[in-house]
């Protein structure tokens, strides 16, 4: 558990006012985001069968919450970590066409999450996926999509200011791009997270690109990424410098998805070639799935950012250690 207490914190909204603001942000953002990227909202599962290989393995070590169903006693069912792979399969199953996509209201449990101001075991995000052509699997496609998402987030600042002027947190006017290798070259003695703090404070809003593969100096990845959805050379995180906590806040992780060739390489790098036998991976390697770009946008994180909140527990209901709750109460942080 790690907790940062901002000095002289003022939540500015009551709990009931905060709830009204959360609803407004969620409803407004998803409509504008869907229109901007040409996405249709779709229903999505909260759990998947382990044998399908559809669950997100995250960094490869986190264990999902799992159970057995009475009517399917021989099948292990897992609560999703995210819908990263499910969405790509859904685009094929549901007959989406070129430059069409979907988004979902994704709820997940990550029971091994380290709790702090930004992290909860409960994850809520808009998970989205969109079909692109093979020729569009480029850095420029990725950057253009990041700019589109940033434009919607920036517009939400004005929407929130109009409804809740006393609470809105002001965002930078543009987003910048930097690779993880550039960060390591500039600050080789810092940790990846410290590098992100540095660049976010310097630039305000940044898309940190190319996460998952080994860096040249350290020989280690900037951060862990599953080998079977993002292409490690065409992905990244949208981060903002967050003044209330003097740290960067990550709002979205996204990327152009693996091709058959890049997934094969990444599975080898991750020592996970056994996944090639799973149904999803077989389809992908056989070229049966569309080329896509996709990601997730944290709903609670976005609400936290736009409202200037000190703790994610102010914008979502979850479970927290008693000593964390007590410290928050002592410092005017209103945990739901």
From Swiss-Prot:
Documented EC number(s): 6.3.1.1
According to UniProt, the reaction catalysed is:
L-aspartate + NH4(+) + ATP = L-asparagine + AMP + diphosphate + H(+)
**Pfam families, from UniProt?**
AsnA
Cite the annotated pathway: Amino-acid biosynthesis; L-asparagine biosynthesis; L-asparagine from L-aspartate (ammonia route): step 1/1
Keywords associated with the record: Amino-acid biosynthesis, Asparagine biosynthesis, ATP-binding, Cytoplasm, Ligase, Nucleotide-binding
What's this protein's family per the entry? Belongs to the class-II aminoacyl-tRNA synthetase family. AsnA subfamily.
Instruction: Spell out the protein name for this chain.
Output: Aspartate--ammonia ligase
- Organism, as annotated: Limosilactobacillus reuteri (strain DSM 20016)
